[in-house]
A protein has these predicted regions:
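An extended, acidic, His-containing surface patch that forms the Zn2+-binding/catalytic region
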Residues: 19-108, 116-129, 137, 141-198
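Alpha-helical metal-binding/catalytic segments enriched in His/Glu/Asp
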Residues: 1-17, 113
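Generic solvent-exposed, charged/amphipathic alpha-helical segments
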Residues: 7, 11, 131-135, 169
Length: 198
């Protein structure tokens, strides 16, 4: 089936048991300053890093069960937000609506993929690598096509200057009674790169 072929092709990209993207070129080393900031923020926020999200839940025999995050380690949760690549399927074609589905083979399966990359990974190069990974040597000589549809490299803030870090900490201490914490946000905002270039 075309869906099984799609699963096999996506298995080249992602470990479905862990969600880890397999191409090493889609990963990068976390800069030392960002790692230190994440460690400090994880110590401040603890479990609130992931508990504050409205996790999906269902009622099972009177006891409410909640979906769990992929990690309950506060530091890892912060790093996964920005410094680990992530695959999401954001759309699908070739599937009838449930009420119209029958016991037939469908002629094709199409997915729209969203790939979030760490800010130090070149997006244009990653798109080309992804195209090769998905299209080459398709199972059963099936025709697999990938249209990159664009992409932009993320942004990593320049190193924090001592005077700015001191000003942030003083303001945070005055208002919150604690040192400043830093949280990176995954997702590309191309404007940030343009602004940083002047």
């Amino acid at each position: 089936s075309s869906f099984r072929i799609m699963r096999q092709v996506l298995d080249r990209l992602e470990d479905s048991a862990t969600g880890r993207l397999l191409p090493q070129s889609f990963h990068c080393e976390v800069p030392a300053e960002r790692l230190a900031q994440a460690q400090a923020t994880a110590a401040i926020l603890g479990e609130e890093v992931y508990r504050r999200f409205p996790w999906a839940h269902y009622d099972c025999g009177g006891s409410t069960q909640f979906a769990l995050p992929t990690t309950t380690d506060p530091l890892q949760a912060l790093l996964k937000r920005t410094w680990e690549p992530t695959l999401s399927v954001t759309g699908a074609e070739g599937f009838p609506a449930l009420q119209d589905a029958g016991n037939v083979l469908r002629p094709y399966t199409a997915f729209k993929l969203s790939l979030r990359l760490p800010p130090l990974v070149d997006a244009a190069q990653a798109v080309q690598e992804l195209k090769t990974l998905l299209e080459d040597n398709a199972p059963y000589q099936a025709r697999v096509t990938f249209d990159g549809g664009g992409g932009a490299t993320g942004w990593n803030a320049p190193a924090t200057t001592p005077w700015f870090e001191q000003a942030l900490n003083e303001a945070s201490q005055a208002h919150f009674g604690a040192s400043c914490g830093y949280i990176g946000q995954g997702g590309t905002i191309p404007l940030m790169n343009m602004l940083s270039e002047g």
